[in-house]
């Protein structure tokens, strides 16, 4: 029934040090743990063992390039849509360099697709089902000739981008939408 949560974690290969650096691994795993709680999973895959499993996956695969890591925790079995368990989990990793758009920036449009409201689905959880919302916005942006979409909430305020956070720098200070703007926390 789409009851799953995930994280997207970057690992950056440093050729000079011949070492892979995982970006904020503990923070990401704490968020996947929080997402499980928000989604009311009956059992929780804790952050610590997920961190350990991720480090072990990196060690066994011996990556010598930057990677994208995706841990996922899901409700397993054929229960009712209101089932809270049991859970299953897996972690995937693929080599993935830094996209050129990180350096060049993107052309974005304000989408006609509204960001899901925390009143209808828990937008603050990193749930796979929630990402269909930004998928529609992203498809619209590409069809209209843009690279990405910026989504507004039901109050017409900037919420987030298509699968990304939105912020501006004003006088050296980062300004983001508030946590009450239906953002991913």
Task: Put a short name on every predicted segment.
Residues 1-56, 80-185:
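Helix-start/capping segments and mature chain N-termini
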Residues 50-77, 94:
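Short, acidic/charged, Gly/Pro-enriched secondary-structure junctions
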């Amino acid at each position: 029934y789409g009851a799953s949560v995930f994280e997207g974690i970057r690992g950056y290969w440093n050729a000079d040090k011949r070492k892979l650096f995982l970006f904020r691994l503990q923070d990401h795993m704490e968020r996947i743990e929080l997402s499980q709680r928000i989604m009311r999973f009956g059992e929780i895959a804790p952050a610590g063992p997920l961190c350990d499993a991720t480090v072990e996956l990196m060690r066994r695969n011996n990556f010598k390039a930057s990677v994208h890591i995706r841990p996922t925790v899901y409700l397993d079995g054929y229960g009712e849509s209101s089932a809270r368990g049991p859970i299953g989990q897996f972690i995937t990793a693929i080599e993935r360099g830094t996209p050129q758009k990180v350096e060049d920036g993107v052309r974005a449009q304000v989408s006609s697709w509204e960001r899901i409201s925390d009143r209808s689905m828990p937008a603050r959880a990193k749930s796979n089902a929630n990402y269909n919302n930004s998928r529609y916005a992203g498809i619209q942006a590409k069809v209209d000739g843009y690279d990405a979409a910026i989504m507004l909430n039901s109050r017409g305020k900037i919420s987030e981008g298509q699968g990304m956070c939105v912020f501006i720098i004003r006088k050296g200070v980062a300004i983001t939408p508030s946590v009450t703007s239906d953002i991913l926390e």
